[in-house]
């Protein structure tokens, strides 16, 4: 069993994060899943939510992910998201305004996106 896994977090428009990790936690349609080196191969559908990546250097990377797929085999993990952004990139005030606007417009999808962004920031 390898001591680390290679992770690629990719959004539709860009590569968000790439590197070595010891653990990745993501939300799928079947529930939260933690992937460590040596995990059984998997393919799943990502739900909107924060993704936590524990890097090999001991750091933590948090990203807000909005839908997509997760794939793991041979200690290579791919997170292919419709939309993804690192928690450090999220403007909290803008996300809070977007959440309030979505609530007033009764826009459930926009409300869910803003909520995920704020949860990702809260986790970091």
Curated annotation (Swiss-Prot):
Subcellular location: Cell membrane
Molecular function terms, GO-annotated: ATP binding; proton-transporting ATP synthase activity, rotational mechanism
GO cellular component terms, semicolon-separated: plasma membrane; proton-transporting ATP synthase complex
Record-linked Pfam families: ATP-synt_DE_N
Membrane-topology descriptor: Peripheral membrane protein
PANTHER family: ATP SYNTHASE DELTA/EPSILON CHAIN (PTHR13822), ATP SYNTHASE EPSILON CHAIN, CHLOROPLASTIC (PTHR13822:SF10)
Family statement: Belongs to the ATPase epsilon chain family.
Protein name: ATP synthase epsilon chain
Organism of provenance: Streptomyces griseus subsp. griseus (strain JCM 4626 / CBS 651.72 / NBRC 13350 / KCC S-0626 / ISP 5235)
């Amino acid at each position: 069993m390898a001591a680390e896994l290679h992770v690629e977090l990719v959004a539709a428009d860009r590569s968000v994060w790439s590197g070595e990790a010891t653990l990745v936690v993501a939300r799928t349609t079947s529930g939260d899943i933690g992937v460590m080196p040596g995990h059984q191969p998997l393919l799943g559908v990502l739900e909107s939510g924060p993704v936590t990546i524990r890097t090999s250097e001991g750091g933590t990377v948090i990203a807000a992910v909005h839908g997509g797929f997760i794939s793991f085999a041979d200690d290579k993990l791919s997170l292919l998201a419709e939309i993804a952004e690192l928690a450090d990139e999220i403007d909290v005030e803008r996300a809070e305004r977007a959440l309030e606007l979505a609530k007033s417009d009764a826009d459930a999808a926009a409300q869910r996106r803003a909520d995920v962004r704020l949860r990702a920031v809260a986790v970091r």
